[in-house]
């Protein structure tokens, strides 16, 4: 078997070969005369030229390529300074001799003496909602910018008339002629496109083709609501699971394992506030309600300096502000959950609100079932009751003090509750046994966010944030028998365990755009952390006849820490081909009298080979001061978070990434990326059997180790009038080493060598669309015994046991499934919209491996393993009404 490094080196060679072939496949050169350019425009743009033979169309053309310019821009570029005038009439371009005038001067390079002014403002949709990552492009000078996380843009241009194009994916472009003779405030409203989207990213500065970062993916509401939805409920995390380089972990769970990292190595931000518990129903649903999600920026490499605190990924989720002009909303009913969303003005044009509530109703379905079962239970049968539900509540109030000043109050409250009860009346045997339990876990986040336009070039944001995370387990056992007196017996026990995190702090961030070629971001934040990993109370009362014994215990672990971060980054456009994003993130983490310091440099560079081909590379370092202690690979209420202590080092990673991004035509977008990441001071809890590892002196019960993760990722996207295709493939290796656990490198549990996704969506018209997605990846790894040993007789018959060698030494069978669904949209005469969704999970009912049963075959002296799968085909339905 060839080593993994051979395949990785082979992949790098193929990547470089792809670059060379792609570059060589481009046209060798454009036509060299104006006439040849006219012939090319005639063929490609389907236009005809009418002109006198005496016109100098044979002169050499020395201007830029016309290939990717719109017709009006191509014509003005072609005939500029040629002595030829033109006018367009339908499909004809009529040429004439230009009137004598002073020859046009060549463009002057920008200098301090050139008058420059700043165009700035907000880009919004027709509901008044700001648009993140919208593109603002000056077709006159060929420079542009994008809106920030608050929809604000700033573009400094030479004095004079400019043609500005405003664009956003899924919206109609808007062009405005701006006479710039001083600083100009221009707020722009874009209308949602009525036509189906096509991949036209040449002008989208946030597209993978044109942005500087590697490993960035931006997801809007349309991406979330048009992709596959498990149980017909769109989900942020499950959408991200389909991205190349991301493993989902356990089936049906909203796990996120990025470039070999653990689930606690992802930074989840909700309106800039960290979120610790990101799942409901043990991971079946994520905590993000897509009814209020405006934009998701996902980074798996090339992290900008403004982010820090986690090793593997950043998920930056922004929510909608609310309509400033009219009240509207939606109601959704799904198989297991539903929700309502409402937004509108509190004061027209000044203050808006946006609220959304989502709740599961599994408890409403199971409650009558258990009532009927318990009513019909026999005298000797237990009466059982199980109740579970979750809810999310999002609320946001936004107020505009002026065109320059805005204040927003955001709140999120998410909670899961699981109650169980088991009662045995003894069936006439003279005893009673009652057991109860309550599990409660969730988040409460709130932030007060103030933004202010200091000047047309300078944007400021100041926020106060508070985060509360809770996991609480309570259980009771009550057993009694006999009559009260000397012959009676009773046992009573009660256990209460609670884990909490309280974070309070502030952050200040600033955007400064001195020129179109520089976008400076800098800021800092401070957070006070209060961790309570475990606080438990235990009461035990034993009554035997006339005696009574009571035992009571209390344990608590508390840690406080302060964290300070500062960052600075600059997005630099060196020229029309080279762009650079460089910066540094500095952090101080103080705990138990010790201060940890980190300085993480970040750098990303892009070379724009042509408007349709770019090359990128990046290097980032990340430091992480918090860890999640868990005994399973699903989110359980027994998991808890702890900070780095004076006994341990913060986790640290270095990551290199490089890739090629190309758009062969307006329908296709292709990318190929390679990455290599090495991590140090990773943690692994020593062997523990039970629901919750003890938090008392937890830092003495973990092993420190390191990781090595590398791979190649290919992505393809195609969109035409009715058809949309997406495909991705990942080839990766994930290895870890913990010397105190196993002295050599071993594969990670989610070392899925191959991962492939392919999806298709077809719009039939009249609001009907059909979609399907096929998912494949190599099986997760398992640790299986290699030997079965009989230990010698020590006086009581001896014993037998399994012996283990390398951790994660076996791969489970490959995982694959097909999901299909159909959407039906209907708009009523009064403008309301009805949406029906039918979907099928695991359409061909392939039972993928959930666990493996291991047995010793004594006849053959070998170990036998059999995989077990339990998740079958799952149909679902949802109905949404928008009003």
Model-derived features: positions:
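Short, acidic, small-residue-rich periplasmic hinge/interaction motif at the N-terminus
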Residues: 38-45, 82, 88, 93-129, ...
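Gram-negative outer-membrane beta-barrel transporters
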Residues: 676-678, 700-784
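Face-selective signature of the C-terminal outer-membrane beta-barrel domain
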Residues: 398-416, 439-593, 608, 612, ...
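C-terminal beta-signal and adjacent terminal beta-strands/loops
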Residues: 362-365, 767, 776-798, 815-883
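Transmembrane beta-barrel wall of Gram-negative outer-membrane proteins
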Residues: 336-360, 376-420, 438-460, 466
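Outer membrane beta-barrel strand-and-loop segments of large Gram-negative receptors
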Residues: 503-505, 555-559, 645, 649, ...
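Periplasmic N-terminal accessory/gating domains of Gram-negative outer-membrane beta-barrel systems
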Residues: 143-146, 170-172, 184, 202, ...
